[in-house]
């Protein structure tokens, strides 16, 4: 029997709004400049990067103990309908968050701009394609703990992942992420949250 998220994903949203690291160092700009206030996403508090593995970073919010591994895309492809406008967005990312001593991480995609609630995003790896049907503002999730497990297992066995989505103004886009360092970052996030002891 599936366990469906209701409260958990709302908590996830609140935690990540405040906690997720803005990963902007050492990268080229993959999206339009939103510095003039045109971005639809909220401002994000920057937390220190505790460890880095390949394209993945590990951070923690000391106020509530939440830990996460996250990565920004390598590149973005857009498919814009006529007069849809440019894709103006904050830094997009995919993340796996550990909160409330839950050993099953919660996967999320932050598009950096508001997503169309009528069009599910999708995550594609070399293993499978999984829908991200739970949409709230610029976030997209899977529905259940079992789906999170499938996503994480698929990411762990792949080299790259693509998230395809549609924004509220009709722009379709695909973000490509490298999974180099994903397994190591996931392990370190668990260690940081006290969910895993590598010395025992």
For the regions a language model picked out, list residue spans one by one.
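General N-terminal leader/first-domain-start detector
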Residues: 2-3, 27
């Amino acid at each position: 029997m599936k366990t469906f998220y209701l409260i958990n994903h709302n908590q996830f949203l609140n935690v990540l709004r405040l906690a997720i690291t803005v990963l902007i160092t050492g990268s080229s700009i993959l999206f339009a400049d939103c510095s003039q206030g045109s971005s639809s996403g909220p401002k994000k508090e920057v937390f220190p990067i505790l460890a880095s593995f390949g394209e993945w970073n590990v951070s923690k919010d000391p106020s509530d103990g939440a830990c996460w591994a996250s990565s920004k895309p390598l590149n973005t492809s857009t498919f814009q309908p006529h007069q849809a406008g440019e894709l103006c967005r904050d830094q997009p990312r995919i993340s796996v968050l550990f909160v409330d001593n839950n050993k099953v991480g919660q996967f999320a995609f932050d598009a950096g701009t508001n997503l169309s609630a009528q069009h599910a995003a999708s995550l594609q790896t070399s293993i499978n394609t999984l829908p991200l049907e739970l949409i709230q503002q610029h976030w997209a999730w899977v529905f259940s703990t079992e789906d999170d497990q499938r996503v994480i297992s698929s990411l762990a066995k792949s080299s790259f992942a693509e998230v395809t989505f549609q924004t509220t103004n009709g722009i379709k886009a695909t973000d490509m992420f490298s999974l180099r360092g994903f397994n190591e970052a996931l392990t370190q996030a668990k260690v940081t949250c006290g969910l895993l002891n590598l010395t025992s």
